């Protein structure tokens, strides 16, 4: 059980933690694509890192700044790091006009703190900070060293993590509170592919998809000839002369079954006209409503990681050049090499060229490792509910860290508007998560 002195400190310093999080939200730390002001991810991200390292240094921890890519704070630098806790201080952009309040000025409403980064991932970083403060204030010694890692580019490719790994080793046990409870222990592998072909289909322009990792909600096409297809138009398709459009439903590439792919819907309609041979071929490779890769011959599944998912996420035709994007999330029962070989063969058979742009192996930390079992025990102790490992199609900050897992801070069945408008974190959950982080540190590194 969490010592009373630790719980009391966390409870009595709750407002202080809220104030710290408010200050941290105040840094508009959207990582810049290019270095700015001599900082790799821009000045606001650097200022956010400086702010957190100042807090940790004042706590007596030994801090290292890895050239503003990542910061590290060691509890006891005379010992090798045993537990790594990985958070990030960069955030995704916010459209201020869509928010009820300024996304970079924290606001308390309805016992929640609103602001960009409240749940992803500044709130978790503050929870870890105050967990460490509570342990220190309670006079508790740790027999193993904790290294608190704070990155500045998780949202844009995790180059911060790559930079750190080029200069220092990762602790043998690592978790990130940049995911969901109870524990994310398995993340599917990913392939992102581009396919191309010079098409003879009578298309002036085809436009669909703006993100490679999302089911597109809209697709439109301008034709150079009258459409003579036999397919039923359906309510999703609108026609204005030689212009057609399909209205679908957006979804993340890791959960495509919750969407309605506008690309495949429009391809199926166009493919009913014999003049649109390439559209018909693509409709066969990506049957509308199919998300398991059957059309490409790659459907597979296993009990632990679930089924493969596959979407055509972007498709554009301009001056006769057809270019598209495919996002595939595959389970641990197959390999990226096997999937890529089959996909390229399927495209080649239809006359398309296909090349891989991103390749990532699955990430899997076995459920029965002592580290995972320790964290599950902490979750059960703190929440009173059964802890289970979960698998996801997306990726977390520890995807490329052997043995790493995501542990919090999102509770099941909560929508925190992460990456959306009015992102928030309930104040009560900030306190609960601080207790969770403290309990995890003490179980793994305590006496």
How would you label these PLM feature ranges?
Residues 56, 64, 256-311, 316-319, ...:
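An extended, acidic, His-containing surface patch that forms the Zn2+-binding/catalytic region
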Residues 155, 161-331:
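Midchain, well-structured core segments that form catalytic/ion-binding scaffolds
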Residues 94-108, 190-192, 196-197, 238-246, ...:
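Acidic-glycine-rich active-site phosphate/pyrophosphate-binding loop
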Residues 9-16, 20-27, 51, 55-59, ...:
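Generic non-transmembrane alpha-helical segments
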Residues 26, 30, 104-106, 249, ...:
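Short connector loops/turns at beta-strand edges and beta->alpha or beta->beta junctions
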Residues 2-113, 140-142:
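Acidic/His- and Gly-rich active-site-bordering loop/insert found
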Residues 62, 81-150, 156, 421, ...:
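Active-site metal-coordination/substrate-binding segment of hydrolases
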